Amino acid sequence: MISRLTGKLVEKNPPQIVIDVNGVGYEADVSMQTFYNLPPVGESVQLFTQLIIREDAHLLFGFATAEERKTFRQLIKVGGIGAKTALGILSAMTADELARAVAEEDVKRLSSAPGIGKKTAERMVLELRGKLVAHTVTDGLFAAAPAADETEDIVSTLLALGYSEREAKAAVKGVPEGTDVGEGVRLALKNLLK
């Protein structure tokens, strides 16, 4: 498995790039988000990668961050979404934007990505709910990835009780870090009832 490449960027032709690693040129497809963040040709670059092996080809996909690669891996697990479609989605929106769209069940936003219709967008919401986490705080609803397993367990419990992911994450913000799951759920429910 090729997990990461560090070398000199020798070619940039969207969506493909070539990185020279000790005399071996690795061709990788990258999202446009990654492509626009690449340095000029001739400079050093590091890419996180995902190798997809099919009967007829070995395909290497590159990502600027490990988080983008993780999101790609989640996307290709969704029925009806292949590697090229997943790359198209990550070209249309950042990993954080995708996580927010899934959490908010924004089917319209998801179906605006190339190759994604309404049914596939609905399937994405269903299959990715709770698996993607936004890592930037923009509207006060999303914080960094949960700091402890307890936080994830509290959110999961609230989801099982029928609350939306958005409500659950907002409620958990008022729970002190390190609180055990039982007490955390109680405090989160109290926050929801305010």
UniProtKB/Swiss-Prot annotation:
The keyword Repeat does not apply. It is found in: Cytoplasm. One of its GO terms (biological process) is DNA repair. InterPro entries: DNA_helicase_Holl-junc_RuvA_I, Hlx-hairpin-Hlx_DNA-bd_motif, NA-bd_OB-fold, RuvA, RuvA_2-like, RuvA_C, RuvA_C_sf. One of its GO terms (cellular component) is Holliday junction helicase complex. Gene3D superfamilies: 5' to 3' exonuclease, C-terminal subdomain (1.10.150.20), DNA helicase RuvA subunit, C-terminal domain (1.10.8.10), Nucleic acid-binding proteins (2.40.50.140). Signal peptide: none annotated. Residues 65-143 are annotated as: Domain II. It comes from the Bacteria. GO terms for molecular function: ATP binding; four-way junction DNA binding; four-way junction helicase activity. Residues 147-194 are annotated as: Domain III. Keywords: Cytoplasm, DNA damage, DNA recombination, DNA repair, DNA-binding. Its main location: cytoplasm. Residues 1-64 are annotated as: Domain I. Residues 144-147 are annotated as: Flexible linker. Belongs to the RuvA family. Has three domains with a flexible linker between the domains II and III and assumes an 'L' shape. Domain III is highly mobile and contacts RuvB. The RuvA-RuvB-RuvC complex processes Holliday junction (HJ) DNA during genetic recombination and DNA repair, while the RuvA-RuvB complex plays an important role in the rescue of blocked DNA replication forks via replication fork reversal (RFR). RuvA specifically binds to HJ cruciform DNA, conferring on it an open structure. The RuvB hexamer acts as an ATP-dependent pump, pulling dsDNA into and through the RuvAB complex. HJ branch migration allows RuvC to scan DNA until it finds its consensus sequence, where it cleaves and resolves the cruciform DNA. NCBIfam families: ruvA (TIGR00084). Homotetramer. Forms an RuvA(8)-RuvB(12)-Holliday junction (HJ) complex. HJ DNA is sandwiched between 2 RuvA tetramers; dsDNA enters through RuvA and exits via RuvB. An RuvB hexamer assembles on each DNA strand where it exits the tetramer. Each RuvB hexamer is contacted by two RuvA subunits (via domain III) on 2 adjacent RuvB subunits; this complex drives branch migration. In the full resolvosome a probable DNA-RuvA(4)-RuvB(12)-RuvC(2) complex forms which resolves the HJ. This is Holliday junction branch migration complex subunit RuvA. It comes from Neisseria meningitidis serogroup B (strain ATCC BAA-335 / MC58). The gene is ruvA.
